[in-house]
């Protein structure tokens, strides 16, 4: 006779694996493994580089960027939410809204960065078209910041939700960088619409 009681929902083994791995390795979130894969493939952050992390909370990308650039470099982050995680000596996090601060962001965080990275994502609604449009708006803001604050030859990493605006944003990146790549890390959920656009060598 079958058990008609409630069955326990299956655990998300993917999330459990990366969440536990991040905890074991002292990172605030599993998203760090996406940056690790991007770095391994494209070497967007060099030793001694200066890196700006847009949407840096809870701090995993900022911490790893600081590790990659080393003590002779620096990693600067900005997010609406404060970063509570302990940061390396060469990393600092600012609290603020890049939309509100866009015209004065250079005064707050400096300029001539070697890399600008963005793992920003909008508050999701469950409507794929709306979520993709909101993601596109964040990406355009990130690209404007990157174009204003990157040194010539600098690199750009940006997460975007795939949708109707994806090709438009890809073309914007393509026009501003010597080369560009589209990449979905293995550590992303296979069902996720998120993907990364990497701009290499700001023109």
From Swiss-Prot:
GO MF terms, alphabetically ordered: rRNA (uridine-2'-O-)-methyltransferase activity
Name assigned to this protein: Ribosomal RNA large subunit methyltransferase E
InterPro entries: RNA_methyltr_RlmE, RNA_MeTrfase_FtsJ_dom, rRNA-MeTfrase_E, SAM-dependent_MTases_sf
This protein's record includes keyword Secreted: no
Role played: Specifically methylates the uridine in position 2552 of 23S rRNA at the 2'-O position of the ribose in the fully assembled 50S ribosomal subunit.
GO cellular component: cytoplasm
Keywords recorded for this protein, A-Z: Cytoplasm, Methyltransferase, rRNA processing, S-adenosyl-L-methionine, Transferase
Biological source species: Desulforapulum autotrophicum (strain ATCC 43914 / DSM 3382 / VKM B-1955 / HRM2)
Reactions mediated catalytically: uridine(2552) in 23S rRNA + S-adenosyl-L-methionine = 2'-O-methyluridine(2552) in 23S rRNA + S-adenosyl-L-homocysteine + H(+)
Active site, per annotation: 159 (proton acceptor)
Residues engaged in binding S-adenosyl-L-methionine: 59, 61, 79, 97, 119
Family under the similarity heading: Belongs to the class I-like SAM-binding methyltransferase superfamily. RNA methyltransferase RlmE family.
Top-level enzyme category: transferase
């Amino acid at each position: 006779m079958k058990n008609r009681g409630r069955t326990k929902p299956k655990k998300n083994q993917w999330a459990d694996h990366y969440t536990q791995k991040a905890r074991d390795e002292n990172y605030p979130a599993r998203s760090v493994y996406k940056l690790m894969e991007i770095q391994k493939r494209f070497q967007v952050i060099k030793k001694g580089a200066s890196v700006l992390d847009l949407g840096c909370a809870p701090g995993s990308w900022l911490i790893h960027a600081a590790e990659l650039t080393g003590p002779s470099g620096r990693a600067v982050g900005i997010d609406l939410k404060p970063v509570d995680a302990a940061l390396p000596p060469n990393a600092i996090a600012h609290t603020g809204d890049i939309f509100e601060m866009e015209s004065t962001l250079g005064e707050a965080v400096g300029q001539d960065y070697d890399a600008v990275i963005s793992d920003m994502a909008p508050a999701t609604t469950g409507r794929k078209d709306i979520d993709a449009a909101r993601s596109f708006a964040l990406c355009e803001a990130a690209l404007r910041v990157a174009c204003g604050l990157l040194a010539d030859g600098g690199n750009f990493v940006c997460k975007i939700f795939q949708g109707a605006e994806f090709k438009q944003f890809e073309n914007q990146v393509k026009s501003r960088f010597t080369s560009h790549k589209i990449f979905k890390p293995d550590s992303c959920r296979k069902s996720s619409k998120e993907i990364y656009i990497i701009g290499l060598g700001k023109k």
